Structures are given as C-alpha cells and as structure tokens.
Amino acid sequence: MNTQILILATSAFLCVRADKICLGHHAESNGTKVDTLTEKGIEVVNATETVEQKNIPKICSKGKQTIDLGQCGLLGTIIGPPQCDQFLEFSANLIIERREGNDICYPGKFDDEETLRQILRKSGGIKKENMGFTYTGVRTNGETSACRRSRSSFYAEMKWLLSNTDNEVFPQMTKSYKNTKREPALIIWGIHHSGSTAEQTRLYGSGNKLITVWSSKYQQSFAPNPGPRPQINGQSGRIDFYWLMLDPNDTVNFSFNGAFIAPDRASFLRGKSLGIQSDAQLDNNCEGECYHIGGTIISNLPFQNINSRAIGKCPRYVKQKSLMLATGMKNVPENSTHKQLTHHMRKKRGLFGAIAGFIENGWEGLIDGWYGYRHQNAQGEGTAADYKSTQSAINQITGKLNRLIEKTNQQFELIDNEFNEIEKQIGNVINWTRDSIIEIWSYNAEFLVAVENQHTIDLTDSEMNKLYEKVRRQLRENAEEDGNGCFEIFHQCDNDCMASIRNNTYDHKKYRKEAIQNRIQIDAVKLSSGYKDVILWFSFGASCFLFLAIAMGLAFICIKNGNMRCTICI
C-alpha cells in the first residue's frame, strides 16, 4: 500500500513539473571579437568596424566646382606666370594642385610661402582689382626670356620697372593704394636681385637701392643684393616676392628708387574652398568630402588608417588598422560538448534539461530577435523572440557609431613640409606636433571604442535581466525558478498560456488554485521523504540504546550472584 502511494505521489510530481518556460539570448559562433575596458577578445553577436581602410584612387569631384591647376602653381595665380594665364581669376570650392605645377617663371621665391599657400587653398577663388598706379620717367615693360609666351614677357600681374635708358638713375617714387572693399586685399610685390652689380647699374642706374613698404600694421625696408648665382631658366638673377593682407579702409605705401617689381592688381579671396595636392585622376561620377594625395576617402566611419594628412571632412587618422565597435550582445554559443549533453538529457529530462544559465550560454537559431523564450508543455516545444526587449536594446545601441563620428570628425587643413631654410625648424615642430596628435588620438580612439563596447555588453545583459524579472513578477508563486534561467510552472500551461507570459498578459490568479494544490503535493512528497530519514536515524539510535541497557543489566545480575567481580583500584 505504501509503495502504491509513493508511486502515485511521484507521478503527480512529474506531471506538475512538466510545463516549463525558459529565457535566453541569441548566440551564434561567428568569430567577431571586441575589446572592452576590462577584457580583450570578447566574442559578440554583432560588431561593426570603425576604422576605414578603403581608398578611392581618384579625386571624386561630383557636385563640386573644381579647378585643376595643371602646370600652374597655386601661388602663380597671384603673380601670373605664362602657365597660369587662365587662372588669374577663378571661383571654385575644390582646388587641385599638381606635382608638375610651377608658381614662377623667373627664378626666385615667396616669403612665408606656406602661410600664403594655406590662405589660397582655403579661399573659394580669386577676383582682382586694378590698383591704379601710373608711372612717368621710367619703363614699365621689363621682360625676360624666362617668361615666354609668344616671345619674351613677364608676370601678368606685376610691372618690372626699369630706368628710361640703360645706366640712367632711377627716380625716387612713392605709390599708394587704399582698400575700399569690405574684405581684406592680398597685396604682393617683388624685389629684384640682379646677377651682378653691373647689371643692376644698367637696369636702375648707380647708387644704393632701397624699397620701403608700410601700412597701419606693416612696415619693412628691402635692399637688393646683386651678385652671381647659379643660372635657372637662363637667369642668374632672382626675384623674391613679399605679401601682406590689407584690411578694409587701410592704405599700403611703396617708396622705391629701383629694383622694385610693382603690383598691378590687388587680389581678393572668394568664399571658402578645399585645396589639395594630388596627381590622382579627376572623377565626376563620385562624390567625396575627404581627400589626400592618393585620392578620396569615402566613409561614414569615425576613424581611418589610410593617410595621416587627409583633409576635408575626414575620419580621424589612427595607427590601428581595426577597432571593432560592439553593436550586439556578448556571444557565448553552446559548444559541441554542451550540445551533446543537451541531446542526451532531452531523453531523460526534456528540452531544457541541460541548458545552462541564460547569462552563461545563448541559443543558436533565435534569428528573429536578440532575446527570447523556449517553452515545453503538453502540446510540445516552441521558441519565440521577444521583440520589445530586443528593440529596447537596439534603440540604445543605435547611434553609437554616429556619436563616435560627432566626437571625432572635424575639418582638417593640410600643412605641407615644403619649408624654406628659415622655416625648417617650424616644419620640424609641426611634424612633431602632428605625430604627437596621432599618438594621442590613436589612444583616444581605442579608449572610446572600449568604453562603448563595455556599455553595450552591460546594456544587453541588463535587458536580459529585465526580461527575466518581468516573467518572475508575472508567475509569482505559480512557478519556481530552477537557477538556470527557467521557471517550472505548477499548473497546466498550454500554448495560449505561454503566449500570455511572453506578452505580459498572464493572469496568475486564474491558475493560482491549481498551482497551490500541485505545490502542496510536491511539498508532501518532499516531506515524506524527509520524515523517513528521521525515523531511520531514530530507530538506529533506539536500537543502540536498547543494546547498551541489556548489556548493563546482564553485568549487574552477574555481579550480584558472584559470577562476576568488579575491582576498583585507586
């Protein structure tokens, strides 16, 4: 009879515990790994690359007003050597300098060349205004075979002033120009250093020559330095060009007595543009905002590893070739051993017998969402994704890449290393500064991505916990947690019942009576098993006590009858 009761109780126990619902997250082995603040190489379900490495080997100019200077150097557009005749005035938002471009025809150099080049690169083009200078008693048609058009000529925007006749003394002159425009005027002039003293005397007469230039913010005097130099373009002389930015309503004055290359027109800059040095081919079929010497970087990523001197709206240059940004949860798929154990235990304990906790392992095949449910009941087994928790996590993760871009993108200007002798030290400082910035940003990039990855993984774990708590609050005393991410339900729960748990519409009062009855049956079975253990221990103790009492009684009788003697020695 006792055996029959035990069998019935056990059958009831198994029946009650047959219905089960488990929570888990998607997992599928894909080898996608990210680094966080505390760990390296954590596998995640989804991740995106943040470092661009793909280069377009062309200058993408679609939608841009582009000017290709070809053989003309950018500074040549201000002074006008023959190769720049078509670019003396222009409007553009993308200026391309070529390696073959040349700024000058007669040998010489520009003072503070790189600063002037940067100003012109950022301008949206050039427009010019005649300065109105007139001259008497001198020639204004100086020319040279170094600047050939159909014959010997000179810079289109400059006047080479010479004495009326050879060896005649050049008269002292003063010329002034007032900027009446609302924007600054770029004023440029030159100093001619003859190839010899004799040549200087022939061109400008005898005596020392002095040129003085001044405005409200500028004053400097120049003296030519005649002497032999290596011939370039057939010339041993040199022309050095100087410049200033003249504010609106300010006046520039020139005082000179020879060896002066006079400006003919003042230059005014138009708007904004981007200037690049590149020999890459133009392509009007693609659009770009970030350029470098090798072409165009087209990317929505926050970082790039293509060229440290890219300019425009560019991703930050970093030394790392890859920085993966987690856009999904931690990925811990079931391994082969785990799968074999699951298959073996299904035969004995059902679908969920061997599933580890929902944090330790994920489920493969949960393709409709990041989080979901598996259930087992009398109608069978099923799996369903939870869209709300998945969307909540996605909403918080979406925009991480854009936020990184906002933190890192900016308009870059390119400062080349074509420095003259005086500027070489400045160039070294700029190069050192650039390298230091790259080091800092490479570290910052790695840190920013690691912080975001840490937040993503913590966030997705948090959403899993929220989902688990939602189910626990619904089921209350109608179910029991098994410690592995599952709930053993104490009542019959068909597919509609399981759906109500997933949809957060489960009514625990509806099943409360049945669940309590089944819970009592389970507790009774547990209590009977525990009582039996107590009886066994009590029986064992009573038997030992009875055996000891009998032994002591026999000993007492024997001593009393003289059959046993007990001697106590002190």
Curated annotation (Swiss-Prot):
Explain the post-translational modification: Palmitoylated.
GO biological process terms, semicolon-separated: clathrin-dependent endocytosis of virus by host cell; fusion of virus membrane with host endosome membrane; fusion of virus membrane with host plasma membrane; viral budding from plasma membrane; virion attachment to host cell
Q: Which UniProt keywords apply?
A: Clathrin- and caveolin-independent endocytosis of virus by host, Clathrin-mediated endocytosis of virus by host, Disulfide bond, Fusion of virus membrane with host endosomal membrane, Fusion of virus membrane with host membrane, Glycoprotein, Hemagglutinin, Host cell membrane, Host membrane, Host-virus interaction, Lipoprotein, Membrane, Palmitate, Signal, Transmembrane, Transmembrane helix, Viral attachment to host cell, Viral envelope protein, Viral penetration into host cytoplasm, Virion, Virus endocytosis by host, Virus entry into host cell
Would you name any one GO CC term? membrane
Q: Which residues form the signal peptide?
A: 1-18
Where is this gene product found? Virion membrane; Host apical cell membrane
Provide the membrane-side ranges marked Cytoplasmic in the record: 555-570
UniProt xrefs under InterPro entries:
Capsid_hemagglutn, Hemagglutn_HA1_a/b_dom_sf, Hemagglutn_influenz_A, Hemagglutn_influenz_A/B
Lipid attachment locations (S-palmitoyl cysteine) = C566, C569
Which spans are transmembrane here?
A: 534-554
Superkingdom of the source species: Viruses
Q: Which GO terms describe its molecular function?
A: host cell surface receptor binding
Other known facts? Major glycoprotein, comprises over 80% of the envelope proteins present in virus particle.
HAMAP family annotated for this entry?
INFV_HEMA (MF_04072)
Free-text function comment from the UniProt entry: Binds to sialic acid-containing receptors on the cell surface, bringing about the attachment of the virus particle to the cell. This attachment induces virion internalization of about two third of the virus particles through clathrin-dependent endocytosis and about one third through a clathrin- and caveolin-independent pathway. Plays a major role in the determination of host range restriction and virulence. Class I viral fusion protein. Binds to sialic acid-containing receptors on the cell surface, bringing about the attachment of the virus particle to the cell. This attachment induces virion internalization either through clathrin-dependent endocytosis or through clathrin- and caveolin-independent pathway. Plays a major role in the determination of host range restriction and virulence. Class I viral fusion protein. Responsible for penetration of the virus into the cell cytoplasm by mediating the fusion of the membrane of the endocytosed virus particle with the endosomal membrane.
Q: What is this protein called?
A: Hemagglutinin
- Give the taxonomic lineage as stored in the record: Viruses, Riboviria, Orthornavirae, Negarnaviricota, Polyploviricotina
* Designated gene of the protein: HA
